[in-house]
Amino acid sequence: MMYGRAALALLALLLAGLTPADAGGPAWELWRHIPGVFDVVGPRSDGRLLVAGSGRLFLVDSAGTVVPFASGPGGYADDAGAEAYIAVSPGLHVAGSGCDFAPDDAFVLRLHQPYGVTRVAATGSAQPFAAVAGVESLNGIAFDTTGKFDHRLLVSGPVHGRTAIVAIDCRGRTQVITDAAPVLEGGLAVAPSGFGAFGGALVAPDELSGRIYAIDPDGNVRTVAESGLATGGDIGVESVGFVPPGFTRAGKLYYADRATANNPHPGTDSLLRIDAHTMTRQGLRDGDLLAATEGGATMIAVRCTATCSVTPIIGTPTTAHGEGHLLAVAGQPAAGPGAAPASLNLPAGVVVLFVVLVAIAIAAVAVLWRRR
């Protein structure tokens, strides 16, 4: 009898280590509440993230401290309620224009006439930066960090059922890359040079078809991958972002979850977060492209070498309503001592099989001991 009780106690201890997260794979953490949040970019040179929410900007440090940014006289307050996506300057040189983008300057889509971009200096002062003509609105923004677009700021906007991609230099001058790209919107990103045949291209998602596109500096458009995620307006793939070097050793991924009333995915007005180590167990590697849906925040990784492959990372949809960029930040370690222990993040089938085998083994041991 004593051995039977010991066997049951051992089984209970084993099961206690298998949390719901283990059975379902990686899951987003509701990290910080930010009213109206819809985008996150960065980090700035001081390590803080830049967050947009309901016509306002915020800075968030790695500890989760949220402070208003550019909220004083001459600061930024515009397009409340609209998805005025943002980009933060890494301080790169535009050779063709003989000038630089100042480090940590923020650039915000202007979603009223005249459509364009507002520059918010690192000190918090805001002023019009560029006007973008010929578009019906604007719906995407990203810096060329690789150089094939000469390190310019890239924006997207709908034009008669297609999409225009416009490059903006550090003097605010614009050049249309193409006005015939497929329908796309959301968090855009420029691929690093090692991303197979798509290195240096602008990568953009289309929630309606589920495709992920690459736009070259000459305006040519290619399909990177079929995401395999759910499709449809307010549902399909909305956001992309690349995994930087060192991320899988220590890093965190951020995504904006915007509260959206009367929607099947109502959101929470939270900045979502997930540790790198929970995704590496699913096969994530540095240099991969991450893509997430607007409805439910499910996510895949795309790896391109000679060919491209797609790996599911988060497969279970939630009530999250994702918007803006996916931001992977290297050098942010997982929770330390005192935090909840990390789960194994094993696939559900593996967990069930493991539990069954352990139960059989313990039962067999108990029977043998009773026969002695």
Where are these regions (language model features)?
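Bacterial N-terminal signal peptides that target proteins for export
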Residues: 1-7
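Residues marking helix boundaries in flexible regions
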Residues: 3, 345, 361-363
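Bacterial N-terminal signal peptides
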Residues: 9-17
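Sequence/structural signature of beta-propeller domains
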Residues: 23-343
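Juxtamembrane/start-of-transmembrane alpha-helix segments at the extracytoplasmic/lumenal side
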Residues: 341-356
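C-terminal membrane-anchoring or membrane-association module
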Residues: 357-372
